[in-house]
Regions:
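N-terminal pre-domain/capping segments
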Residues: 1-111, 183, 210, 253-254, ...
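Acidic/histidine-rich catalytic cores of soluble enzymes
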Residues: 17, 42-43, 75, 138-236
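Active-site acidic/histidine proton-transfer and metal-coordination neighborhood
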Residues: 21-33, 67, 84-187
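Acidic-and-aromatic substrate-binding clefts and catalytic sites of carbohydrate-active enzymes
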Residues: 22-24, 46-59, 82-86, 122-125, ...
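Short, hinge-like loop/turn segments at secondary-structure boundaries
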Residues: 61-63, 91-93, 132-133, 173-175, ...
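Short, charged alpha-helical segments
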Residues: 233, 242, 254-266
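Catalytic-face loop-and-helix region of soluble metabolic enzyme cores
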Residues: 239
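Short acidic/histidine-rich active-site segments
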Residues: 246-251
Length: 272
């Protein structure tokens, strides 16, 4: 099992020290460097950071990746808020164009997984026919699968708790979508924080080990893992079922360097 951490949107600096504003390029390169320094195997970034890069910056990161100096395993926050999935024909065309450009760019940087969380853009409007909306989400996922096939990536569906969206709130529901669509490049993510919010049993991990390719971890109050009970059982279950993918710390931080290091040490100790 590999351990990873999301590159934070805030400061890399210890509390009390001023950080110079960073470009997307600098945040990505510094983020990957800091994760290695803190004891992680990999890093996870947002798709927004990737899409904010200039063409020259993409070329520089491609060269760094080929040289083994830059590595991201996954990206999250896939779809920006101005591109809802439940939309009209013109909106769908813009959405699908973004999907193709984003997956193409991520693949060119050696990124293997894209996380379909994006709770806001997948929310089904109250006044919308739910069956029709779910059909639109299915069509979107099929389009993502086609782009992943084209560029050599995998999309993992991330169930999110009911406070964040009203479609696919549990790992069991996410697994049902993955199995029903049965697409080559669309698999499942389990997030311990969202599972704890929904009161979901660890059993769902064992039941879906065959399609579970990526995991997120945090405490039940979305702080670093190792501070509440649920995430310990979550990680123990992943070990028991022989999960051999990535576990990424995705949480809020106070002092990033200090807390991310503590989280890495806790993960290493639990996995030993």
């Amino acid at each position: 099992m590999k351990i990873s951490c999301c590159i934070p949107g805030g400061s890399f600096m210890p509390q009390g020290e001023k950080e110079v504003p960073m470009s997307s390029y600098d945040r990505l390169t510094e983020g990957c460097r800091v994760m290695r320094e803190l004891g992680y195997d990999a890093a996870e970034a947002t798709v927004g950071l990737i899409m904010a890069l200039t063409d020259d910056e993409v070329s520089a990161l491609q060269a760094a990746h080929r040289a083994g100096e830059f590595s991201l395993d996954a990206c999250n926050s896939f779809i920006p808020g101005h591109l809802p999935i439940i939309t009209d024909e013109k909106g769908t065309a813009a959405l699908y164009d973004f999907v193709d450009r984003a997956i193409s760019r991520m693949a060119s940087l050696g990124i293997r997984y894209v996380v379909f969380g994006s709770g806001f853009v997948r929310r089904i409007p109250e006044d919308c026919d739910r069956a029709a909306a779910e059909a639109q989400i299915d069509a979107f996922i099929c389009q993502v699968d086609a782009c992943c096939e084209k560029y050599g990536m995998i999309c993992v569906i991330e169930p999110l708790n009911k406070a964040e969206t009203n479609w696919c709130n549990t790992v069991a529901e996410g697994a049902a979508v993955v199995r029903r669509l049965n697409l080559k490049n669309v698999k499942l993510l389990a997030d311990g924080y969202h599972m704890s919010r929904e009161g979901e049993s660890y059993d769902v991990l064992a039941e879906n080990r065959d399609i579970l390719l990526h995991c997120h971890i945090a405490s039940s109050d979305r702080k670093i893992p190792g501070t509440t009970e649920y995430e310990g059982g979550f990680l123990d279950t992943l070990k028991e079922i022989g999960y051999n993918g990535i576990v990424t710390v995705e949480c809020g931080f106070g002092d990033f360097r200090e807390e991310a290091k503590i989280a890495a040490e806790w993960l290493r100790a639990k996995l030993a």
